């Protein structure tokens, strides 16, 4: 049996210049039969005994509703994901993507139920979640928080932005400049909460190899960065905390209006 791989990570969140409150939330936790263990802002951990989960959520809504939606979403995911170990111990091995689908739908309904007064009405959140197991990386996303993979110097977006403008860009109907200036670039047709009965996340299962790096981020980071900037920083081979600082500084210097949150993860 080959030695278990180690995951290194670093994270950062920065409040945008537009408002006092940061509506972004992020979480890093180790998932095991004992439950979820919250991880520090940066560190490294073996996949031998734990699954590792990293997620970013951008909350939307008036007052403190956005902050509430994003933090409620991630808190619940940290409660639900470790339950897979209990079902496995009982002899049932859940399909992790199906499990994630049910978990996200359940939190979607919970956020809708919590949006029952003037303060919280219409509150919603995006999600970009990566779940590392010893065999595979499972990911889920809703909205326009993103997950990128950098492998052998090549950057690919694993998540899907749930906007019509992004779809037009990806199928080549418009270029990156037109996309970035599109008036409806942030008009999301999928969110968690927001009053709709169902949510339809994007899911994927991706094998990972040593040397892979992942970026999980809110749209605030993307506002100030071209894709080539992300590709260059992710392929630089620098320590993960340094990549986080380089990307965040560049994004905030170039834009900085929206909240900016990112996690960089490297498999070693």
Locate the predicted segments by residue:
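PP2C/PPM-type serine/threonine phosphatase catalytic domain
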Residues: 1-268
């Amino acid at each position: 049996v080959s030695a278990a791989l180690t995951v290194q990570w670093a994270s950062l969140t920065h409040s945008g210049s537009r408002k006092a409150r940061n509506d972004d939330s992020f979480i890093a936790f180790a998932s095991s039969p004992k439950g979820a263990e919250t991880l520090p802002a940066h560190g490294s951990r073996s996949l031998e005994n734990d699954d590792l989960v990293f997620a970013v959520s951008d909350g939307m809504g008036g007052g403190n509703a956005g902050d509430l939606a994003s933090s409620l979403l991630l808190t619940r995911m940290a409660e639900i994901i470790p339950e897979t170990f209990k079902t496995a111990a009982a002899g049932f091995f859940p399909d992790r993507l199906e499990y994630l689908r049910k978990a996200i739908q359940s939190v979607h309904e919970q956020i809708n139920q919590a949006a029952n007064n003037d303060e919280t009405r219409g509150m919603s959140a995006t999600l970009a979640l990566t779940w590392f197991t010893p065999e595979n990386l499972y990911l889920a996303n809703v909205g326009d928080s993103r997950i990128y993979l950098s492998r052998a110097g090549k950057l690919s977006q694993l998540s899907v932005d749930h906007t019509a403008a992004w779809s037009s860009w990806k199928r080549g109907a418009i270029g990156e400049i037109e996309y970035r200036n599109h008036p409806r670039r942030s008009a999301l047709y999928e969110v968690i909460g927001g009053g709709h009965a169902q949510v339809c996340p994007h899911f994927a299962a991706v094998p990972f190899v040593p040397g892979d790096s992942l970026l999980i981020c809110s749209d605030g980071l993307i506002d100030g960065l071209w894709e080539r900037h992300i590709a260059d920083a992710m392929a630089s081979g620098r320590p993960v905390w340094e990549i986080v600082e380089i990307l965040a500084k560049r994004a905030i210097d170039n834009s900085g209006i929206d909240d900016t949150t990112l996690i960089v993860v490297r498999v070693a």
